[in-house]
């Protein structure tokens, strides 16, 4: 008999940036495990296509166009999610932008700094605040999951804004884990390594880059969005009622070196 702790039937999950890559990999697994799913994205055609793909699991699926760096958009979008799907049990703040190779601190201007931090850090704060208020008011607990990065725990030149945004997410997660535990809300983060997504396509297609990075990955492959599905289900399930404030690294062993 299958372990019932991972059954998400009756639960509702929200995944920001859920229209591709890691986000879609998680949303797909959550729907397969029985959850109704809402995905947020910034491109309508791509987001609608992702929603259609998710519907094959027979669950309710809702798609919205949202810039998570805009506080009002997040507040309004979350209210719509609840109106359409009834409530939210699991919120995955996955939406993010890349900052790698955009300039050293000697060259970077404030506009570039804010381009990254408004989405990667402010966006998580806005999303988590909306979700936490809803979960506390509902009184049935819940799960918050933030997408950080291995950039939060290791240095990478020319990406101080990206590393700072992801390191900030990890610090936020630990603080909120303590703050929200009394409401039976768990808060955890996921730290991806080198994952094949739209954002990394150019870098991975560079033979010099791939030749430098791939030998440092014990698994000898790039990660893919589907690698994050099982963890998303685990963190959304009742199996993690006593797990909070943790950083889960998915990097094929990259940070072991």
Predicted regions and their residues:
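Short C-terminal tail/terminal secondary-structure segment
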Residues: 2-5, 102, 154, 233, ...
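Conserved glycine-rich cofactor-binding loop
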Residues: 19-20, 43
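Short, small/polar-rich loop/turn modules that mediate ligand/substrate recognition or access, typified
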Residues: 92, 181, 186, 243-245
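Substrate-binding pocket helix/loop in short-chain dehydrogenase/reductase
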Residues: 102-105, 109-117, 213
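Active-site helix of classical SDR
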Residues: 128, 165, 173
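Alpha-helical segment proximal to the catalytic Tyr-Lys
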Residues: 133, 178-182, 241
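Residue(s) in the substrate-gating loop at a strand-loop-helix junction
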Residues: 149
């Amino acid at each position: 008999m299958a372990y019932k702790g991972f059954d998400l039937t009756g639960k509702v999950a929200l995944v920001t940036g859920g229209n591709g890559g890691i986000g879609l990999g998680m949303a797909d697994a959550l729907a397969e495990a029985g959850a109704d799913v809402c995905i947020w994205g910034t491109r309508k055609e791509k987001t609608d296509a992702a929603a259609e793909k998710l519907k094959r699991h027979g669950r309710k699926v809702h798609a919205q166009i949202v810039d998570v760096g805009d506080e009002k958009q997040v507040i309004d979008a979350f209210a719509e999610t609840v109106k359409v799907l009834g409530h939210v049990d699991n919120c995955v703040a996955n939406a993010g932008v890349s900052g790698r190779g955009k300039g050293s601190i000697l060259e970077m201007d404030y506009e570039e700094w804010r381009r990254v931090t408004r989405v990667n850090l402010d966006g998580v704060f806005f999303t988590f605040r909306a979700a936490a208020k809803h979960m506390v008011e509902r009184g049935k607990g819940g799960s918050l999951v933030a997408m950080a990065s291995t950039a939060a725990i290791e240095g990478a030149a020319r990406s101080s804004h990206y590393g700072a945004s992801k390191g900030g997410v990890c610090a936020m997660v630990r603080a909120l884990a303590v703050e929200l535990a009394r409401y039976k809300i768990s808060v955890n983060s996921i730290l991806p390594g080198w994952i094949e997504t739209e954002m990394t396509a150019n870098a991975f297609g560079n033979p010099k880059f791939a030749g430098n990075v791939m030998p440092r990955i014990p698994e000898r492959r790039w990660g893919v969005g589907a690698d994050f599905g099982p963890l998303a289900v685990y963190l959304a399930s009742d199996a993690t009622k006593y797990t909070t404030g943790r950083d889960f690294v998915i990097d094929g062993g990259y940070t072991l070196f």
